[in-house]
């Protein structure tokens, strides 16, 4: 099967994307007649594969036995597991890592002047994958996120794409759009309202700046002077440096601030956390109230998870925000896999 299509995105690396690949599917059945397909794609800049089950009923998946073995002298840049992905990518030679460890995607490798980035794409109805490795071993094992040692796979289940981006230089990896190409198209045809950009972030310099409209207006002025696009709140939207507060609901000057920002072509992100937004009623209230106040985006915090629930929440929150033409910024967040 040949794939050859073009598409556009509201933002990204290029004005037009080309998705061109050769695809082949290998079909297997076990003695019980259960079906397994392995779908493989070859691109100019990498390869990817996924598993597809022929299950007609929900099934529980407990393990995945996928492994990837590299040369022991391979140089790697990868993050040790941490729930909020706020860590570093130290350079390490693969077979010199002397302790058992779990790592997060993406994993960048260099061996024999060949660069490769290992990651995954299209993760919507399953937990994200991590990698585990034994001491001095050059073999990675795919493991599911900690919260989902077992999860329920819906009928006709498809895994994420196991993705390998390759190039002779690091620029080939950086410029690749393989993850985008492996994802399905959006359900939204109207994307003209999407305005990505740089944000002024008052909390970084003054974690109580959110309490004072005059201070926030100065940050709006800064954003306008710097030709940035956004002002972004952080913990909390109003009046406390800690977790979510309901006080913002009664603050009268938020519409004045957003109107002032719009006069200078600056849009404003609000802030809240998953414990408020993990149900539709909570999202409906916050999203609709934000729009009434003139806020054009929301920063969603403290997801801290790669579970199936967390991956599906991100997709749901983005879809519901998009219906209101509202941007979403996730904080302490997993890597981009396509949502």
Where are these regions (language model features)?
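Generic recognition of flexible, low-complexity loop/linker segments
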Residues: 37, 149-152, 219, 257, ...
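Conserved aromatic-histidine-acidic binding/catalytic patches
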Residues: 39, 207-211, 245
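Short loop/turn segments at secondary-structure transitions that flank enzyme active sites
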Residues: 57, 74, 169, 206, ...
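Aromatic- and carboxylate-enriched substrate-binding clefts and catalytic-loop regions
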Residues: 235-339
């Amino acid at each position: 099967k040949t794939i050859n299509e073009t598409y556009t995105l509201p933002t990204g690396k290029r004005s037009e994307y080309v998705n061109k690949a050769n695809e082949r599917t290998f079909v297997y059945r076990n003695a019980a007649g259960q079906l397994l397909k392995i779908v493989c794609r070859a691109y100019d800049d990498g390869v990817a594969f996924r598993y597809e089950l022929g299950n007609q009923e929900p099934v529980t998946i407990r393990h995945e036995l996928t492994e990837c073995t590299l040369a022991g002298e391979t140089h790697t840049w990868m993050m040790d597991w941490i729930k909020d992905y706020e860590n570093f990518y130290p350079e390490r030679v693969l077979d010199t890592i002397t302790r058992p460890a779990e790592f997060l995607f993406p994993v960048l490798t260099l061996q024999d002047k060949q660069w490769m980035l290992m990651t995954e794409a299209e993760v919507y109805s399953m937990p994200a994958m991590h990698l585990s490795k034994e001491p001095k071993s050059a073999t990675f094992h795919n493991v599911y996120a900690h919260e989902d040692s077992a999860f329920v796979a819906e009928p006709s289940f498809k895994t994420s794409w196991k993705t390998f981006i390759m190039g002779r230089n690091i620029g080939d990896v950086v410029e690749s759009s393989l993850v985008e190409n492996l994802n399905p198209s959006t359900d939204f045809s109207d994307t003209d309202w999407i305005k990505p950009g740089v944000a002024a972030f008052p909390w970084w310099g003054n974690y109580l700046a959110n309490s004072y409209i005059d201070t926030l207006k100065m940050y709006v002025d800064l954003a306008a002077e710097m030709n940035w696009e956004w002002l972004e709140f952080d913990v909390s939207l109003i009046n406390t440096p800690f977790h979510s507060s309901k006080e913002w609901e009664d603050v009268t000057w938020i519409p004045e601030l957003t109107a002032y920002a719009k006069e200078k072509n600056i849009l404003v992100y609000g802030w809240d956390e998953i414990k408020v937004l993990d149900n539709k009623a909570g999202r409906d209230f916050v999203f609709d109230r934000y729009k009434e106040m003139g806020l054009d985006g929301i920063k969603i915090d403290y997801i801290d998870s790669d579970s199936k629930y967390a991956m599906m929440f991100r997709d749901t929150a983005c879809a519901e925000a998009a219906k209101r033409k509202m941007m979403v910024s996730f904080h302490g967040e997993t890597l981009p896999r396509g949502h």
